[in-house]
């Protein structure tokens, strides 16, 4: 009887080891596939001309491409496989399943040429595996004076410019390793008497590979049908125009990979790499890093490069170049506040400062 029990136990152990080896092989294969995709894509860029610049200016709602919060911006926006808080609503809806508590966030950026950008979001756990969230994005300026050929300093009349996006998000943890999420958002762009409206969708996935802390994500953002402005405008000849060309939304495909090469009780270093494929510009690679001390203080760094450019030196074909930032976690009794700052260099266009405040409740 004892021998039979030992035999059964050995068979079960061997079966478990085979399953573990099979799972490891699958995970390694996925990792190799991801790495191969980056390598092949970068290699092809040396052989095939980069025509991404010819796609510039073909899509609408450009404000949706502006990073939402300071943490993500400081890491070069290479965060689709990193996010674990309410900012996931913007970067990767599936990342909401990594958050351990409900959270609210507000972020402000002094954008270029006196433009202001705001992002606000909140999340709520229906249960351990199901999370919902809402978000609001705004890009706006002060009223601008109307100028003409004969009155270049202004006519005395003003017009308004502003963009908004209001979204609802749902994320679900399917297994301990795989999660997905989606955001449906109403988007409106207003310039003087013209306005453009659309309903767009974000879809994201998050997969823990089982190899240490390795994980990767696939995200499709701003997916929807073509749109055209409504309203009227006066052209240079003084004619009133009411019919306009349609434009596609700024759809973006993102593939990201992240892991922790250094993780101890008081120290953690996260490294991430991300490939972006926009429909209106050249493919680009983002690299990001975050150092955490004692789960209280954070330092971040990020780099963006168009496919084919060297990671060293100044970016040649993109305005956005280097970014960095810092953050601090402040315990406040029953809640926790996260304050983050980001500095982004846009070379000739200038510098953008962002600050974010997130509160856990």
What are these regions (language model features)?
Residues 1, 6-18, 23, 29-30, ...:
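Short polybasic linear motifs
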Residues 23, 31-34, 57-59, 166:
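A general marker of short, structured functional hotspots
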Residues 46-361:
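Subset of outer-membrane beta-barrel
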Residues 18, 26-27, 34, 40-41, ...:
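Intrinsically disordered, low-complexity N-terminal regions enriched in serine/proline/glycine
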Residues 8, 18-19, 32-33, 39, ...:
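Generic detector of low-complexity/intrinsically disordered segments
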């Amino acid at each position: 009887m004892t021998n039979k029990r030992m035999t059964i136990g050995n068979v079960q152990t061997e079966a478990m080891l085979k399953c573990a080896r099979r799972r490891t092989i699958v995970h390694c294969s996925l990792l190799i596939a991801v790495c191969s995709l980056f390598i092949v894509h970068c290699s092809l860029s040396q052989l095939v001309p980069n025509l991404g610049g010819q796609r510039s200016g073909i899509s609408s709602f450009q404000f949706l491409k502006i990073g939402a919060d300071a943490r993500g911006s400081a890491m070069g926006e290479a965060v689709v496989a990193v996010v674990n808080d309410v900012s996931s609503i913007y970067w990767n809806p599936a990342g909401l399943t990594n958050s351990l508590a409900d959270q609210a966030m507000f972020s402000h950026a002094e954008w270029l040429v006196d433009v202001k950008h705001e992002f606000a979001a909140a999340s709520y756990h229906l249960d351990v595996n199901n999370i919902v969230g809402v978000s609001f994005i705004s890009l706006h300026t002060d009223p601008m004076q109307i100028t003409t050929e004969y009155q270049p300093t202004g006519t005395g009349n003003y017009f308004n410019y502003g963009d908004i996006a209001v979204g609802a998000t749902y994320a679900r943890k399917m297994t301990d390793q795989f999660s997905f999420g989606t955001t449906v958002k109403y988007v409106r762009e207003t310039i003087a008497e013209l306005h453009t409206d659309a309903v767009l969708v974000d879809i994201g996935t998050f997969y823990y590979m089982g190899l240490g802390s390795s994980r990767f994500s696939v995200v499709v953002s701003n997916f929807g049908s073509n749109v055209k402005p409504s309203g009227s405008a006066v052209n240079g000849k003084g004619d009133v125009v009411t019919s306009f060309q349609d434009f596609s939304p700024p759809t973006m495909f993102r593939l990201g990979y992240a892991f922790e090469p250094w993780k101890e009780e008081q120290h953690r270093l996260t490294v991430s790499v991300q490939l972006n494929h926009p429909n209106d510009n050249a493919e680009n690679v983002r690299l990001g890093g975050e150092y955490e001390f004692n789960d209280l203080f954070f330092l971040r760094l990020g780099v963006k490069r168009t496919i084919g450019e060297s990671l060293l030196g100044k970016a040649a074909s993109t305005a956005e170049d280097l970014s960095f930032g810092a953050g601090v976690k402040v315990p406040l009794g029953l809640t926790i506040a996260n304050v983050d700052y980001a500095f982004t260099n846009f070379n000739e266009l200038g510098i953008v400062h962002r600050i974010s405040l997130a509160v856990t409740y």
